[in-house]
Swiss-Prot record:
Induction: By IFNG/IFN-gamma (at protein level). May be involved in thymocyte signaling. It is found in: Cell membrane; Secreted. The lineage of its organism: Eukaryota, Metazoa, Chordata, Craniata, Vertebrata. This is Secreted and transmembrane protein 1. Belongs to the SECTM family. The chain crosses the membrane at residues 146-166. It comes from Homo sapiens. Disulfide bonds join 38-55. One of its GO terms (cellular component) is membrane. It is a single-pass type I membrane protein. Glycans are attached at residue 56. The keyword Cell membrane applies. Residues 29-145 are extracellular.
């Protein structure tokens, strides 16, 4: 039995060669693709909590650009050359090799919106992710009636000063009343003293004055001797020496 060798036409051989070349080229190119893997879709976080969004590529980043679109306005958050660590208004971006992480500390309403990533490695890639912040900003604690320490110290100091001033005022008023009362009583005291002195002087003067008795005070009797013819003394009846004299 005779066999016939397979033979391909010329255009078929050229086509196969072209396909092999393209496959080899694609394989070589695939080794340099970034193949980014990023946080996508919608990320929800409660008010005040932290959140992280990231993008990873097969090659090292050379440039990272992140923008935020919210309320119809678009603003650039980071436009940095990698690698490095960057921070701004609660956002923190860290780029090292093929890893880029965006950290939000204490999410607020101003952090919510559409984040647009523009990544540059061996290729340029664009990614988007939406951040939603739920919940409302916590209200400040109601006044419980307690005063802060500086206010308490100030109030106590003012109270002490007021008490001291009040005590001084009362003492001053009492002293003024005593002085006024003394000034009012001083003339009366002087008059009373003059009267007392006058009465005492009159008493002394009346004691020193001599007042005659209504009847004379009898004086002691004296013996009177009269010569007798017989040459002897005759004893007469006693007679007062000064019959009409009176006691002083």
């Amino acid at each position: 039995m005779q066999t016939c060798p397979l033979a391909f036409p010329g255009h078929v051989s050229q086509a196969l060669g072209t396909l092999l070349f393209l496959a080899a080229s694609l394989s070589a190119q695939n080794e340099g693709w970034d193949s980014p893997i990023c946080t996508e879709g919608v990320v929800s976080v409660s008010w005040g909590e932290n959140t992280v969004m990231s993008c990873n590529i097969s090659n090292a980043f050379s440039h990272v650009n992140i923008k935020l679109r919210a309320h119809g306005q678009e603003s650039a958050i980071f436009n940095e050359v990698a690698p490095g660590y960057f921070s701004r208004d609660g956002w923190q971006l860290q780029v090292q090799g093929g890893v880029a992480q965006l950290v939000i500390k204490g999410a607020r309403d101003s952090h919510a919106g559409l984040y647009m990533w523009h990544l540059v490695g061996h290729q340029r890639n664009n990614r988007q992710v939406t951040l939603e912040v739920s919940g409302a900003e916590p209200q400040s604690a109601p006044d419980t009636g307690f005063w802060p320490v500086p206010a308490v110290v100030t109030a106590v100091f003012i109270l002490l000063v007021a008490l001291v001033m009040f005590a001084w005022y009362r003492c001053r008023c009492s002293q003024q009343r005593r002085e006024k009362k003394f000034f009012l009583l001083e003339p009366q005291m002087k008059v009373a003293a003059l009267r007392a002195g006058a009465q005492q002087g009159l008493s002394r003067a009346s004691a020193e004055l001599w007042t005659p008795d209504s009847e004379p005070t009898p004086r002691p009797l004296a013996l009177v001797f009269k010569p007798s013819p017989l040459g002897a003394l005759e004893l007469l009846s006693p007679q007062p020496l000064f019959p009409y004299a009176a006691d002083p």
